[in-house]
Amino acid sequence: MARTTPIARYRNIGISAHIDAGKTTTTERILFYTGVNHKIGEVHDGAATMDWMEQEQERGITITSAATTAFWSGMAKQYEPHRVNIIDTPGHVDFTIEVERSMRVLDGAVMVYCAVGGVQPQSETVWRQANKYKVPRIAFVNKMDRMGANFLKVVGQIKARLGANPVPLQLAIGAEEGFTGVVDLVKMKAINWNDADQGVTFTYEDIPAEMQELADEWHQNLIESAAEASEELMEKYLGGEELTEEEIKKALRQRVLNNEVILVTCGSAFKNKGVQAMLDAVIDYLPAPTDVPAINGLLDDGKDTPAERHANDDEPFSALAFKIATDPFVGNLTFFRVYSGVVNSGDTVLNPVKSARERFGRIVQMHANKREEIKEVRAGDIAAAIGLKDVTTGDTLCDPNNVIILERMEFPEPVISIAVEPKTKADQEKMGLALGRLAKEDPSFRVWTDEESNQTIIAGMGELHLDIIVDRMKREFNVEANVGKPQVAYREAIRSKVTDIEGKHAKQSGGRGQYGHVVIDMYPLEPGSNPKGYEFVNDIKGGVIPGEYIPAVDKGIQEQLKAGPLAGYPVVDLGVRLHFGSYHDVDSSELAFKLAASIAFKDGFKKAKPVLLEPIMKVEVETPEENTGDVIGDLSRRRGMLRGQESNVTGVVIHAEVPLSEMFGYATQLRSLTKGRASYSMEFLKYDDAPNNVAQAVIEARGK
């Protein structure tokens, strides 16, 4: 089957934003204008097409990033049909993992900001993730019809808070209730959308006289930004020649692809204004799969030779699984992005990460939670496969005869855990199955059994994250669970270097004995300097410990790191240097050296000024001005460090760093302090030494 849409007319984009910027409504409008959806689904009444889990519709927030395919030929039907694959990404900080994994497979992104709230803390997190994957992006300033809407103020915040170079493509005509349309700064015309047909048709008109001067000024800014794309254009511009519309668009596109500028559009998705022109900007300025660098990977040749795959149907098949979802009707759905080649339903592919072959039974293209079965997918496509058995998020799928392992994704460590137990014994097995499935879907969610208490522990990125997991167990798997108190993921570390710590394990009373003897130095590592949080240096000279026992010493220490001597929490940022010891020809063994190493570690750890580390969260609270004092006082009582505050249209934004252990139940307290008028967001920032009294209480509670 031949390709129906040339790859140059593909756009794989994400729609990304903070909570309440109106991202889901924006996506709904995209689906409406591209002709997929004939009745607009509003978030207000829980009917939005992209929010397809029940909890999302109840809570009005987007949890799972659903992928949808749509076609767009332009507002004035000025293009050949372009295939736009949209990945909707959640804005809540507990679901940062969803944003991270969608950024990994996108070619471009639309950042949605609220014209009133502007750039929020969550916007900064998403921005950093987009920077990490070098995703070209444009911005859409939404909610121009709301009280306090100010387009140019948000443009200023994109520059100041995100360190970006924003270039407005449009200006808003009016604001709040008086918002009627936009000025197109490329064409220098006003665009007015027709309210009678929900904005499907529009007219170009003259720029309102009172805006002409402002429009000229920002048009000049746009032309200058375009001219900076090349010396040739700059010479033309400085020579006083006019740049053509085509030259402007081509130059700006190049600068967006190079991540040098962020083009900014505006509108009100709710009022059916602006989304249409933003879609045109997606086509004009965001990359096709062929515009972004080839994907890197490693060949399976025993030497890990670097290789790459280009967005080309003729190259061998390669794809990345970026999301696993459980569908009530068909079981496992594996969402994947094809980077190169072609695959047909019925084909067998290799998962080199698991060394397992998988058969593509059925391939579907998703429209939110509706699906259309297709026979093949090609380079640039995003689709879902039904029935893949052992694939997890981040795995590669490739041609078995041309094996490549694509770059893996990075997933954060959970910061909060709770114990869960089924309400009835009969649910025990069902709960295990449910948690296993959910963990497969979500790599930032972990499940394990506590060896001491035999309880099932679940861990994730925040209270809301775990609430939703428990909720999904009940809804999707019919398992009711009792939930324990949230537990903080503390860590242990040392603060000073200790040298010549000896560990000896010797049992030599006739027959074959046991003998292992090590001498080590222990030292703290700079936090974050080593991704594993541990380094082992073998400095043995003259064979005082034979080479075959060295790995056992390393292993003995690593086993101790899982549960530190202070309170049984994992040990991080530790370096160990093995430099002396002794062995016995007959009695030495790997086990003896493992035990000797663990004895040395325990002794050294106590002497090296051990500390308990607690997770510190970056907290931002938006509150009405009259409640500022109460909110700050409450954060201080929670051992919060204030990092500044600023005023905005709706009140005051307070920035603070607060230990996670002090933030449980904060939402309820904030509601009562401000009569429900404040909101907050929180994300993990760093680990820091817990004060003595806190550390003591934690250690005592752990019964150490």
From Swiss-Prot:
Claim: Cytoplasm is one of the keywords in the record: yes
SUPFAM superfamilies linked: EF-G C-terminal domain-like, P-loop containing nucleoside triphosphate hydrolases, Ribosomal protein S5 domain 2-like, Translation proteins
Keywords, in A-Z order: Cytoplasm, Elongation factor, GTP-binding, Nucleotide-binding, Protein biosynthesis
Gene Ontology terms, MF aspect: GTP binding; GTPase activity; guanosine tetraphosphate binding; translation elongation factor activity
Chain ranges of the tr-type G domain: 8-290
GO biological process: ribosome disassembly
Main localization (coarse): cytoplasm
Organism superkingdom: Bacteria
Membership in a protein family: Belongs to the TRAFAC class translation factor GTPase superfamily. Classic translation factor GTPase family. EF-G/EF-2 subfamily.
Protein function: Catalyzes the GTP-dependent ribosomal translocation step during translation elongation. During this step, the ribosome changes from the pre-translocational (PRE) to the post-translocational (POST) state as the newly formed A-site-bound peptidyl-tRNA and P-site-bound deacylated tRNA move to the P and E sites, respectively. Catalyzes the coordinated movement of the two tRNA molecules, the mRNA and conformational changes in the ribosome.
Protein name as it appears in the record: Elongation factor G
Chain's gene name: fusA
